[in-house]
Amino acid sequence: MKKIAYSLVLLFTAFAVITACSTSKNVSATNDLGRGKVTGTWTVNSITYEGIPENAVQSVFDQGPPSVFQGSTWTLTNSGKGIYALTNGTVQSIFWSLKTIAGSPEFSFKKLNDKEKAKNIESGYTMMVSNADGNNLTLKAPVQYANGNGYIVYNLAKK
């Protein structure tokens, strides 16, 4: 009887180890967007809207209307530090990251002020990455509108 119980425990343990390993492989397989496809200097060359009218959003990133980001330059380093510079001369330091949620890659950033550390900032902004091929980057910011959701779509080109 002890041999049967021991065999069952051993079989269950082996099954748990195999299942745990295969799950981690599936998670990493969906996370194929590396920092290399996002690092560099980017220019916002167009802003479009999906599911919402163009004038539905008055302010994005607590900075101004989406149109102020047209032509802006985003510099993203591999360390996660970065800046964006608007065409009106405004420059904002940020800390950015990539993560995959339910198989969908997301770009997140926190705005940094003088000598402020990203770990001390609780709020930030998250956009879905719908394209990142190393030369073009498309970020979709979700927006609640009326009884549904829409998106502000930022199309960036690498400089």
Where are the language model's segments positioned?
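Bacterial Sec-dependent N-terminal signal peptides
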Residues: 1-33
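Lipid interaction determinants
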Residues: 21-95, 99-159
